[in-house]
C-alpha cells in the first residue's frame, strides 16, 4: 500500500504513508484539464479538513477551482514550497507537486478509490 497512489472522484491522488497518514495532490489528468496553474491557497497545519470539503483553491490560466478532499483529517504538513514556486504543480503534479499530509480520522480504505486517475 505504501508508495501506491489511489485516485478519488475529486481528481485528487492519495498516497498512504501509514494506516492513518496520507499525502494528497492533484491528479495529472485534472492538472492538464485546468491548464497552467498560477497560484494555490493551501490550508494551515493543524486545521481539520472534512471529506467533500475544500482542500485548497487553485487558480489556473482557465479558472479558479476549489479542490475537494476525498478524506477527513488533520493537516500535519503543507507543501509550503508551492507558495513561492508553483512549477512543481505544473511539471511534477504527482510527485513534488503534492499539497498536504493528513492524519486521517480512521484507517485508509483503498477499496473506496481507483488505481487509475
UniProtKB/Swiss-Prot annotation:
Top-level lineage group: Bacteria
Cellular component annotations (GO), alphabetically ordered: cytosol; glycine cleavage complex
PROSITE patterns in the cross-refs: BIOTINYL_LIPOYL (PS50968), LIPOYL (PS00189)
Span of domain Lipoyl-binding: 21-103
Coiled coil (residue ranges): none
Alphabetical list of Pfam families matching this protein: GCV_H
Gene3D superfamilies linked to this entry: 2.40.50.100
Co-factor remark: Binds 1 lipoyl cofactor covalently.
Entry keyword Transmembrane helix: no
Keyword set, alphabetical order: Lipoyl
Cofactor annotation: (R)-lipoate
GO biological process: glycine decarboxylation via glycine cleavage system
Modified residues (N6-lipoyllysine): 62
Family designation: Belongs to the GcvH family.
Protein name in UniProt: Glycine cleavage system H-like protein
Species, as recorded: Chlamydia trachomatis serovar L2 (strain ATCC VR-902B / DSM 19102 / 434/Bu)
Lineage, highest ranks first: Bacteria, Pseudomonadati, Chlamydiota, Chlamydiia, Chlamydiales
Amino acid at each position: 500500500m505504501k508508495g501506491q497512489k489511489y485516485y478519488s472522484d475529486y481528481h485528487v491522488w492519495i498516497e498512504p504513508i501509514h494506516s492513518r497518514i496520507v499525502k494528497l495532490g492533484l491528479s495529472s489528468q485534472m492538472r492538464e484539464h485546468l491548464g497552467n496553474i498560477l497560484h494555490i491557497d493551501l490550508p494551515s497545519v493543524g486545521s481539520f479538513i472534512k471529506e467533500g470539503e475544500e482542500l485548497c483553491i487553485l487558480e489556473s490560466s482557465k479558472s479558479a477551482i476549489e479542490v475537494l478532499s476525498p478524506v477527513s483529517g488533520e493537516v500535519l504538513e503543507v507543501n509550503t514550497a508551492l507558495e513561492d514556486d508553483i512549477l512543481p504543480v505544473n511539471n511534477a503534479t504527482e510527485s513534488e507537486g503534492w499539497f498536504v499530509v493528513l492524519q486521517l480520522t480512521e484507517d485508509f480504505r483503498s477499496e473506496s478509490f481507483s488505481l487509475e486517475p
